[in-house]
Amino acid sequence: MSVTMREMLEAGVHFGHQTRFWNPKMAPFIFGHRNKIHIINLEKTLPMYQDALKYVRQLAANRGTILFVGTKRQSREILAEEAARAGMPFVDSRWLGGMLTNFKTVKTSIKRLKDMEVAKEAGATETMSKKEALMFEREMDKLVKSIGGIKDMGGIPDAIFVVDVGYHKIAVTEAAKLGIPVIGVVDTNHSPEGIDYVIPGNDDSSKAVALYVRGVADAILEGRANAVQEVVEAARGGDDFVEVQEG
């Protein structure tokens, strides 16, 4: 589903930060300012957003994994919902240093969480003392909060989608170190440098954030559906070219 400029306006995508907090590297994407607030040029944002979605679609069609990252209060809930809808991993609580660059260690925690889930399912907490059960639940809750969204990731993602690149600069740095492409929402107070697919836009409004993450989730589902359709059509097409050898 394609997004229009009107929808971007209604979601407040064009509202940047106060002019005194601006990053000069965002100048090419700024239309002007009003009441000391920078206004982002949506004529630049819309095609760049569409480019990002095109990349997402292609990646999803090739069975790629995109890690959603958004831990700010206004993006947390919708980001987790949309990532789950698209069947993609997400980080919505806190970015743990080394989540990408030290994935081997993170895998140990994932295994621990999965083992605990299996144990709980089997009724392990029922045979524990009250104190043990409480400790177990606390540890499990902590793991779910920190790595629950990536427990089925399996390995390093093919790309990461970040809402607010400044707030998540550790995630962006780790991705760059590993050569993982970054799709990022960049507001007027941050730098677009090092971001492979820049989406110049408001990163604070929950309406704007919902627009970005829904769009990315839709693009993933479209990419997957298109890939399935191509396989079906190729199989059908194969039937048309079967030569019948006459004896």
Swiss-Prot record:
It comes from Ralstonia pickettii (strain 12J). GO terms for biological process: translation. Keywords: Ribonucleoprotein, Ribosomal protein. This is Small ribosomal subunit protein uS2. PANTHER family: 30S RIBOSOMAL PROTEIN S2 PROKARYOTIC AND ORGANELLAR, SMALL RIBOSOMAL SUBUNIT PROTEIN US2M. Belongs to the universal ribosomal protein uS2 family. One of its GO terms (molecular function) is structural constituent of ribosome. The keyword Ribonucleoprotein applies.
